Amino acid sequence: MDVSALLTSAGINIAICVVLVSLYSILRKQPANYCVYFGRLLSDGRVKRHDPRWYERFAPSPSWLVKAWETTEEEMLAAAGLDAVVFIRMVICSIRIFSIVAVVCLAFVLPVNYYGQKMEHKEVHLESLGVFTIENLNPRSRWLWVHCLSLYIISSAACALLYFEYKNIAKKRLAHISGSASKPSHFTVLIRAIPQSPDQSYSETVSKYFTNYYAPSYVSHLMVYRDGFIHRLMNETERMCQAIKHVSPDLSCNPSLKSCVLCGPAATNSFQIISNETDSVKGLELGELTLTTTEEERPVAFVFFKSRYDALVVSEVLQTPNPMLWVADLAPEPHDVHWRNLRIPYRQLWMRRIATLVGAIAFMFVFLFPVTFVQGLTQLPTLSKNFPFLKDLLNRRFMEQVITGYLPSVILVLFFYTVPPLMMYFSTLEGCVSRSQRKKSACLKILYFTIWNVFFVNILSGSVIRQFTVLNSVRDVPAQLAKLVPAQAGFFMTYCFTSGWAGLACEIMQPVGLIWNLIAKVIVKNKEESYETLRFPYHTEIPRLLLFGLLGFTNSVIAPLILPFLLIYFFFAYLIYKNQIINVYITKYESGGQYWPVFHNTTIFSLILSQVIALGFFGLKLSTVASGFTIPLILLTLLFSEYCRQRFAPIFQKYPAEILIAMDRADEMTGKMEEIHNNLKVAYSQIPTCSEESSKAGCTSPCSDQELPDSEELKPEKENLKADYIWEFQRSKSGLDLEVKSCPSASPIRNSPGFAEIYKRT
């Protein structure tokens, strides 16, 4: 690839970014798009719907950039939680590291590479990108010490910044733990693989076991029931309420003058009845509700203890000599529980993990074919030879630049859109009991997949057979990487343009949400001001951020021309991600900063990989002095990684007993323990309820990951048909085991069996 092809790709992507960002600055001002670009603020009720002047609404403005820049870390922590702060700290750490890397490499390494004597120089726009790489140096060049010294500076700066950031994030996590005093998960242990007894139920078995062995600390427990029936009933009832809500007020809000056989004549308003029923449900205490149906108990229970320390001890010790029974773990937060996966038998989990690992590896190798095809596009002689009918087209200068500089990265990015949903599906099949754990598992899978396919497969590709041939010679891996990385420097730059710059522009534009909102408002004619609240996609954005960090480290002393483009990406990411976090995405669950070890370990891996590649290149250039100095650098980096693992990693894996005991003593002194114990069953109940405050913002149950989609607007002539169908469906699902109270209205169309009628007071 030459400079003109690189500039063509950069120009196309810059134009795309400018257009999308300009459109965003206009579309975000339109009141009809508030639900797309201000979802989090709308859910908090903090957006005032006002129409600015017409000429201001259609003029691009950088006000959102100023707002994102001025948002402090404390504001983000209060609004979006610790995970959002940790993610922004990842971006900031990347900016700091690569600012130093860019200054060192652009000031010293790049001039040395460019003025090497191995390649012949041409006009600037016709220059091959190889003249900017270390390949342009002759063997035994006396300038290789510049690369070795730069590698030492880069490694020292990166390790120092990583250490201080790790220390800072660890303090934030400890503050997060001590600051969440009323979290029910600190008092709760999730017990799985409860043994079945022919003489008693699972609930009785749990009560007997913990009363026997943990009598001083055991409070109570809550069994997990088969969720299929409960969720279907709740979802259909919610849909019926949505359907009635969307009915035209002229037809639905008039008082009903029909008489009821049981209740007598009454002039009632159907919507007023539903409102009153909802208020009565909210008045019930969930701790007083039990299932009246014959729901099947699962061998899973939430067990509550008197103190945080008691729950911590129970979760850490082995309960029985058989480790496959009475498996105890600290429970996730109520809104973080993945209720559907709790029904998976514990003995199946290890088989599921193996199966998903095999499936992910198989998909990784299947993905070799599109990656190899993409690499074929970058080789014009091979492309002309295999497709003779394209020869005339490829001889045109502009088409050559587009095909070699822009098209390969676009095709690869499009193929990668299939990866996150599949990896999330694999993580769900693993049986993760919490949604944050599932998202972190998907993040790791996507990270490994991305590094393997974008970096290793691309630099080793010629054909699938040749890749296996190269990988068989493990001893020659550093030398092979040193030969192939400079050759792919141009592709990595164009991938930074397409996946990095243009990807961020698409992220802020939210094209899927915008199109969906347009369909709902224009085609479906939905006048309801509804919106879907989204969660931040850590499982896709963290791997992307780390991939560009890997490309920056591995190309720093080999092909430093990529560094300014990466810095632009990181600065752009800092502003856009902050804007999205404070305006668009909501936080219903989080991992407590557990993504930071992923960032730290991957950055260390990237740093060591860059040192190994440099070692291989010093060997190819026959520089024994530079090779000798690089080996101790690799060992020192490994020692630093091990120190950080011993010093900081346990903080992100376990809770410190010292902090939990201090929190227990503080709650005992203030008399909060009894209140916390009374709320434990309410928090982990499978029955969803809304408080007055949460109902204003659109409450969701702990069982659901996303809000229910709004029903389509009903036509007046189809009102009775739709309502009759829902009513009959509810009655058929209820069966004879449910006690459904009669409604004061004459028509069943205008009523729904509330949740208070499905359950009774104990």
Curated annotation (Swiss-Prot):
Its main location: membrane. Pfam families: PHM7_cyt, RSN1_7TM, RSN1_TM. One of its GO terms (cellular component) is membrane. Keywords: Calcium, Ion channel, Ion transport, Membrane, Transmembrane, Transmembrane helix, Transport. One of its GO terms (molecular function) is calcium-activated cation channel activity. It is a multi-pass membrane protein. The chain crosses the membrane at residues 3-23, 90-110, 144-164, 354-374, 402-422, 445-465, 500-520, 557-577, 594-614, 615-635. It is found in: Membrane. Acts as an osmosensitive calcium-permeable cation channel. Belongs to the CSC1 (TC 1.A.17) family. This is Hyperosmolality-gated Ca2+ permeable channel 2.2. It comes from Arabidopsis thaliana.
